[in-house]
UniProtKB/Swiss-Prot annotation:
Classification via PANTHER family: SAUR-LIKE AUXIN-RESPONSIVE PROTEIN FAMILY-RELATED (PTHR31929)
Transmembrane segments: none
Family: Belongs to the ARG7 family.
Domain of life: Eukaryota
One Pfam family from the record: Auxin_inducible
Induction data: By auxin.
The species this protein was found in: Glycine max (Soybean)
UniProt keyword list: Auxin signaling pathway
Protein name: Auxin-induced protein X10A
Keyword Transit peptide listed: no
């Protein structure tokens, strides 16, 4: 019997908490900021070893290096592109 990995956690966090940097990050998740508005998402760390997510990480490295002033990982792509990638990962 397999386990289904939980998807990104943005939908389960109240809107006022999602914009707060002081929200605790659950074990097994990390914070990423995406898009022009730097929207905050919590993603499972298991996404980090997936090739499609690694492409996003490579974009982040090329644009920002290892300097991420928001306190979390900044991914320089459009929000809809990020949601497409993560929704495919959630289906795995």
């Amino acid at each position: 019997m397999g386990f289904r990995l939980p998807g990104i956690r943005k939908t389960s966090i109240a809107a006022n908490q999602a914009s707060s940097k002081s929200v605790e990050v659950p074990k097994g998740y990390l914070v990423v900021y995406v898009g022009d508005k730097m929207r905050r998402f919590l993603i499972p760390v298991s996404y980090l070893n997936q090739p499609s997510f690694q492409d996003l990480l490579n974009q982040a490295e090329e644009e920002f290096g290892y300097d991420h002033p928001m306190g979390g990982l900044t991914i320089p792509c459009k929000e809809d592109e990020f949601l497409t990638v993560t929704s495919h990962l959630n289906d795995l």
